[in-house]
């Protein structure tokens, strides 16, 4: 079935996996029902790329920031540079930033850079896109401290943690993981989260849904997650669910697109 109003809350179309056919793919997405994509930077170099893509494709927007795996060469004036980039009309958020304790980037450095970007998001009154991998305790300690307008992307916590996130004013995005066999926690969260706080994402090119797991992901495949979550929530119309999550994206990112 052909769906419309597909809004991908979180992707990485600057990734090298798209180098062979990026323009061809991105030109085709609106024909597949995609109405919006927020492309997330991981450092200052990728920030320039995601802004350039947002300039080229009307349906695309950008988030700029430092990812916790990309902190080897952070310049002293990085906050000033990020702040300058946010003045671009297609930049809608700070991100992707957060904490990732799966890898070996020093935790004190991760926490400092994340906290500084949290403060910046408040100073600029902008949403912030949060990465939280195996770091729930420290991530939520900082979210409690600053209470930003945050999207916890690819949410991997429990229902209890989701409820705390909602109380803090956060939004949550889910994607292809909900189609995996071992996705019990994600399914429970999808079933319980207030519908007005739920966004859909791909994290493209990663996290492709079943039956494409392990292959390159793109925004048109978000429908597999949408179908699964609609089923879990007993929403009879997948299109209605896509309409709701697209409106949620517009609300979170302060967009006038629908």
Regions found by a protein language model. Name each.
Residues 1-258:
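Mid-domain alpha/beta scaffold segments of enzyme catalytic cores
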């Amino acid at each position: 079935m052909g769906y419309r109003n597909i809004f991908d809350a979180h992707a990485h179309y600057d990734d090298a996996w798209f180098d062979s056919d990026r323009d061809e793919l991105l030109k085709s997405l609106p024909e597949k029902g995609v109405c919006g994509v927020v492309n997330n930077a991981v450092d200052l170099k990728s920030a320039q790329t995601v802004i350039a893509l947002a300039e080229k494709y009307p349906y695309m927007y950008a988030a700029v920031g430092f990812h916790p795996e990309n902190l080897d060469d952070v310049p002293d004036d990085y906050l000033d540079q990020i702040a300058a980039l946010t003045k671009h009309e297609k930049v809608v958020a700070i991100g992707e930033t957060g904490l990732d304790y799966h890898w070996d980037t020093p935790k004190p450095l991760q926490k400092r850079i994340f906290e500084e970007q949290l403060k910046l998001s408040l100073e600029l009154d902008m949403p912030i896109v949060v990465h939280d991998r195996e770091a729930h305790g420290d991530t939520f300690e900082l979210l409690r401290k600053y209470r930003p307008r945050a999207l916890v992307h690819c949410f991997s916590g429990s229902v209890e943690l989701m409820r705390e996130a909602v109380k803090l004013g956060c939004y949550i995005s889910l994607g292809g993981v909900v189609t995996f066999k071992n996705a019990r926690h994600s399914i429970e969260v999808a079933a319980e989260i207030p519908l007005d706080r739920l966004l859909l994402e791909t994290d493209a090119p990663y996290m492709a849904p079943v039956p494409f797991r392990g292959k390159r992901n793109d925004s048109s495949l978000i429908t597999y997650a949408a179908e699964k979550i609609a089923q879990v929530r007993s929403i009879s119309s997948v299109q209605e669910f896509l309409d709701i999550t697209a409106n949620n994206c517009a609300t979170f990112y302060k967009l006038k697109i629908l």
